[in-house]
Amino acid sequence: MDSARLLVSNAASANSFHRNGHPFSSFAELGKSIALALPQLQDAVLDGEIVCLDRKGRPQFNDLLFKRSQPCFFAFDLLYADGKDFRRDALIERKIELKRFLHRVSSDSRLRYADHVEGSGVALFERVCKIDLEGIVAKYKFGPYGPDGNALSTWYKIRNRNYSQMVGRNELFERDRHKEPVPGWHACELACAEAA
């Protein structure tokens, strides 16, 4: 699934947004579950992916599309937490803070840490294609947070052209497109502004 920004506010609610600002009301229950997993939280903005996993722990887009299992949120970036804006920090520093931040979460939570691999991009991509995953994202580890389509962007999405679950992806996003996008040039900008 395309990246979803997650806004957790006062540990009472969590809202997910598509990167273009459209809210994902389809995942309201996931947001509540995540908010409950962070009882001592003030505010946070996480960037990550909403996925459903099969028995082997692999993402299954069709399960997400047809709500066949409970989704979870894999956080791969921390943009804002407990009053601090991390977007200008290096990715590697944000990952350290994210791991520290998620240490508060119980192991059975639907909020999970998405780890990274350094220096083995080609081998990782070959493995991803072999097990039929969507692709990988390559990021500059010392770069600041830069949303896609922005001059500050320091990452590249590399897609598996033979990914078997590509069909139907837009259908999931269209469910919530009838709603107006949240004002702001980018969902993470809005989320960080609301959290501050």
Segments predicted by a language model, with ranges:
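Catalytic cores of nucleic-acid ligases and guanylyltransferases
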Residues: 1-196
